[in-house]
Regions:
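PLP-dependent class I/II
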Residues: 2-296
Length: 296
């Protein structure tokens, strides 16, 4: 998936083309756009919209230089999803301005509200959408480095040229594993989705008990709690948490400036480990609040 993002941008962008990148989001989009000669334009997503991209936000960011929108849903780090009704509104703006979409759907099998809908399936969108996906998240095959891209032949053919000269091909062993996953892995994916959903609900329950503000994510395997009440930056909070409780979480700012005041919490761990992590998190937060009461 990661290489496909790079190849797609190299194939599609001319120097100076603007790439719209909603944030918080995966860290590779901005550098890939720059390496391809593009100009990244960040759209800051808002917690009050559950970190979804709205048609109004998209419309406001488009200029005559806009070539491509990156659509990173289900989202890393927020866990946000785009429902079909959201995508339909986005699609109308895309068609109106005649731009392309790079839809990163690597977490498409991990949704907990409704089945994932790809924007490429909407009327008039297939010919202007590159869909990126892979096996790392859906089938827990992160180390196999196997992904794929779907889209209009004219773009895929150019991506293939870049791919051939960059790494030649994915390892044959990974490709055989991918075929096996597609043929016989559906039951495993469903079981994993159910397990993740239980962990997701557990984390949300614990954060509520701690009194932390946290919107409910319905995709991927991340929760994005707000820690702004403590008067610390996300990086300061994460660093102190690591030093005092030996618990490592990722500052929201790792995924864009608008991630300030948030932390990314992954639940791609056993429930036993998550319980221990939440106990340490609660102890840390309790200490901060007691410290604040003394200073007040």
């Amino acid at each position: 998936g990661s290489e496909a993002i790079d190849a797609a941008m190299r194939a599609m962008l001319d120097p100076g083309d603007e790439v719209l990148i909603p944030q918080p989001s995966y860290v590779s989009y901005v550098p890939c756009a720059v390496l391809a000669g593009g100009v990244p334009v960040v759209i800051e997503l808002k917690a009050e919209n559950e970190f979804r991209l709205t048609a109004e936000e998209l419309e406001a960011a488009i200029t005559p230089k806009t070539k491509l929108l990156v659509l990173p849903f289900p989202n890393n780090p927020t866990g946000a999803i785009m429902e079909k009704s959201d995508l339909e509104k986005i699609a109308e703006v895309i068609k109106k301005h005649d731009i392309f979409v790079l839809s990163d759907e690597i977490y498409s099998e991990l949704t907990y509200l409704e089945k994932h809908v790809t924007i490429a399936s909407l009327p008039g969108m297939w010919e202007r959408t590159i869909v990126i996906n892979g096996f790392s998240k859906s089938h827990a095959m992160t180390g196999w480095r196997l992904g794929y891209a779907c889209g209009p032949r004219v773009i895929i053919e150019q991506m293939l040229k870049i791919h051939q000269f960059a790494i030649m091909c994915a390892p044959s062993t990974s490709q055989y594993a991918g075929v096996e996953a597609l043929k016989n892995g559906d039951e495993d994916v469903a079981q994993m989705r159910e397990e993740y959903n239980g962990r997701r609900r557990y984390l949300l329950h614990r954060f509520k008990e701690m009194g932390l503000s946290c919107f409910e994510p319905f995709g991927a395997f991340y929760v994005f709690p707000c820690i702004s009440e403590f008067g610390m930056t996300s990086e300061q909070f994460a660093t102190e948490l690591l030093n005092k409780e030996k618990l490592a979480l990722v500052p929201g700012t790792a995924f864009g400036d608008c991630g300030e005041g948030y932390l990314r919490v992954s639940y791609a761990y056993s429930l036993e480990n998550l319980k221990e992590a939440m106990n340490r998190m609660e102890a840390f937060i309790t200490g901060l609040r007691k410290q604040g009461e003394k200073q007040a």
